[in-house]
Amino acid sequence: MIFASRAFVCLAWIFWIMIIDNFAIGKDNASMSVIEKPEYNPTFGSTYQRVKARGKVICGTNPDFLGFSVLRGEAAGFDVDICRTVAAAVFGDSKAIEFIATNGKTRFEFLRDGTIDILSAATTYTFTRNVIKKLEFLPTTYYDGQGFIVRKTLGVSSAKQLEGAKICFSSTGTGAKNIADFFTKHEINYIPIPVPPDKNAKNIYLAGDCDMYGTDRSGLASNRLSFADPERHMILPEIISKEPLGPVVKYGDQKWSDVVRWTIYVLFIAEEMGINSHHLNLMPTFVK
C-alpha cells in the first residue's frame, strides 16, 4: 500500500503543478496575442468525464500476480496501488476504485471498449503495441526482463543446458519471440508450447506438460511463491530480454492520459524527496 499512502501526500504536489502550469499557460497566451497562434488541436477523449460522473476509477489487473495485484485473496500490491493513487488524485479517495481481472486476450480489448479506464497489469511497452495497435503507454514503473523457472530435479543451473526441452509461455505476450531469439542465438533446440490466455502457462508447467516456464522474472518470482512446494523450483540466472512495464490507457485520450501520467510523475518526485507515509505527520500542513 506504499503507493496508495503516498498518493494523499502527493495530492498537494499535483495541485501546485497545476497552478504552475496554468500560470505558464497564461503567460504563453499573453505572448501569443501579438503573433499568430499555431494550429494545435489535441484529441480530448471522454474517459475523464466518464470517470468523474461514475465516481470511481475502473482498473484492469492481473488477478494472479502476488506482490503486484493480489495478497491473500485481496487486491493489493505494486500495480493496484498505482490505480489507487490515480483514484486519490481524481477524487481525493484511494478507495474510489474498482478492479477487473484481465488476461493476455482481454486486457487491450477492455481498454478499447471502455470496460476499464486504466490497465495496470505488468504490461510491456513495445513499439507494436504503441504505434501499430494504438495503445497509450505511460511512464515505466518497473523494469524487468524475461527469465525461466525449472524444477530442481531437472539438475540444471542454466537455460543453456536445456537442449530439447519443452518450454511453456503465454501465446499473447512478448515471450515467444524472446525465447526463439535466445535459443536460436545459442543454437539450442527446444520444443515451444504456446499457452492461450484462458489457460495459465503456470498451470501447464505445474501439470508437468513442459520442462520449463518462461515469463518476466517478477512474474516467475510471484508464481513461485504461489506454488505448493516453491523450494522445489528455481529461477535460472539468464535474463533474455528487457521488459519495461507500466500502466496503459486508451490511445488519443489526451486529458485522461495527462492525469495518469502526471500522477505517476508526482510519485517519482515524492520518492526522490523521501516523502512517504512513515513521516506524514511531520510534514508541513500545506503538504498534507
Where in the sequence are the language-model features?
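Solvent-exposed, polar/charged alpha-helical surfaces in well-ordered, non-transmembrane soluble domains
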Residues: 49, 80-88, 109, 113, ...
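Sec-exported extracytoplasmic/periplasmic mature domains
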Residues: 52-53, 87-95, 112-116, 153, ...
